[in-house]
Every structure is written in C-alpha cells, then in structure tokens.
Amino acid sequence: MKTSDTSARPVSPPIEGRTGGVSYFTIPELTSSATAQREGIDNCPPKCAYHLLHVLVDQLLDPIREAWGEPIVVSSGYRCKELNALVGGVKNSHHMLGCAADLIAGNKADHRRLFKLIQQMQQEGKIRFTQLIWGGAKGAPLATTEGLSSQRSVACDSNGRWIHISYVPSDLRCQVIGE
C-alpha cells in the first residue's frame, strides 16, 4: 500500500451520535481517501458497509477514543474493491466490508500505549474485536498470519506506524498480531 500524508486528515471533535451517545468519528472520515480522489475512484460504501461502519464506531472506535482521552486519526477505513487493490490490500480485507480501521495516535510511544490500552480493554471485557494488528514501518516485516502479507505497508504516521483494528460481528476472535 502507498503511504499517505495524514496531516491534512480531519480529526473530529465529539458529536452527538446515532445511538444517543457521543461519536468521535464521522462516516466521511472513515471513507475519505486521497488515493481514491487522486485516481477518480468512487469510494462510497454500499448500504451494508455503511451499517457496518456504524457498528465499528459504536463497538470499537468510540469506546477506544473515550478511554484514550485524546484524538485518534483514522488513516484508512472503508475501501471499495478497486481502491483496496490499488493500495495493495489483501483480497479478503475487512476494510472492504466496512469492518476495519487503521489508526494513528502520535509517536511510537503513543502507538505502543494505545495498542496496550486496546488489549487491556479487551481483557477487561469492555470491547471485543476480530483483529488487532501492530503495523510497522513501510516495507518492514510484520507478523504473518493467514491473509496477511509479510511485507506490507499502509497509510501510516511519519514514522511508518499504524494500528489495524477490525470488528466482524460474526467473528470476534480477539486475535492480536504483533507487539
């Protein structure tokens, strides 16, 4: 995947959510893609993916952001099939379902702290997820698992770090890869 500059990506302040709670993320944040814009790709999610993006926010992103207490940038959320292929995503990517987000949380220490916080929240029964993946520098070897490449890069912070998290309602295995 291509590394993108996330400095221009919007970071949402809290807004009133759909379920009466607070939502820190918007659907436009989760579907925005500089690559799609540049390449003229329509990255609008179908209705089923739109619904799953709301589930992702409600079940994972908002609780994580609330516990974190600071802004978290979504560097990659929903990807249509064409965009996913263009950026080098795996063929069975949860991003194409609207079930995944790649997160950026500052420097390496912040990333490590956020990754550990997400694990702690899962261990305490506060959240469940499908996969939590520690992403390394562009082109750096990552932990290999079924469906993941061992040489993969994604939209990341200036130091090449990202955290992938997914929520597939029928597959909450809480798989942790890396760190």
Residues of each region from the PLM?
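Acidic, His- and aromatic-enriched active-site or binding-groove loops in soluble protein domains
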Residues: 91-113
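Catalytic micro-motifs at enzyme active sites that drive phosphoryl/nucleotidyl and oxygen chemistry
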Residues: 88-93, 151-155
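Catalytic cores and adjacent binding grooves of peptidoglycan-active enzymes
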Residues: 4, 105-179
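Amphipathic alpha-helical interface surfaces
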Residues: 56-60, 83, 99, 110, ...
